[in-house]
From Swiss-Prot:
GO terms (BP aspect): abscisic acid-activated signaling pathway; defense response
Family of the protein in this entry: Belongs to the BetVI family.
Keywords assigned: Cytoplasm, Pathogenesis-related protein, Plant defense
InterPro entries cross-referenced by the UniProt entry: Bet_v_I/MLP, Bet_v_I_allergen, Plant_def-hormone_signal, START-like_dom_sf
One GO location term (cellular component): nucleus
Gene this protein is translated from: PR1
Keyword Cytoplasm in annotation: yes
Name this polypeptide is given: Pathogenesis-related protein 1
Length: 158
């Protein structure tokens, strides 16, 4: 078993608060609307969006080796636009990973947009290749899809 971590940054032209709300807090609702070829649906399994909430995202892409992801919110800071989540089911848990957590922070930038900083930590099961490059690409696609939606809908998530 191998432990690993990576960090990634994505610059977007949308304010940190709007990106945080859309890409993190409401992604289970927004994702299926803006990337239906990738996300079939989403829901809150338990909780109210605060720490301890469990959300499920159903994947609609045959290139992804799992059909859903369930994640638990471990930390949410609405003032600093931060969230930490842990994979609790699906998403390769037990097949690719022993465990995985992801920390997102949306930092305001001087141009009115923000810098999305992501740090992932995980334990890969024996014989499984580290696919962090694909994960980073997925994060970039997630943020850029959210950015495009918010730029096209300036009153959304205000």
């Amino acid at each position: 078993m191998s432990s690993g971590s990576w960090s990634h940054e994505v610059a977007v032209n949308v304010a940190a608060g709007r990106m945080f709300k859309a890409a993190m807090l409401d992604w289970h609702n927004l994702g299926p609307k803006i990337v239906p070829d990738f996300i079939a649906g989403g829901s809150v399994v338990s909780g109210d969006g605060s720490v301890g909430t469990i959300r499920e995202i159903k994947i609609n892409n045959p290139a992804i080796p799992f059909s859903y992801v369930k994640e638990r919110l471990d930390f949410v800071d609405h003032d600093k636009f931060e969230v930490k989540q842990t994979l609790v089911e699906g998403g390769g848990l037990g097949k690719m990973f022993e465990c995985a957590t992801t920390h997102f922070k949306f930092e305001p930038s001087s141009n009115g947009g923000c810098l999305v900083k992501v740090t992932a930590s995980y334990k890969i099961l024996p014989g499984v290749a580290d696919e962090s490059a694909k994960a980073k690409e997925g994060i970039t696609n997630h943020m850029k899809a959210t950015e495009a939606y918010l730029l096209a809908n300036p009153t959304a998530y205000v």
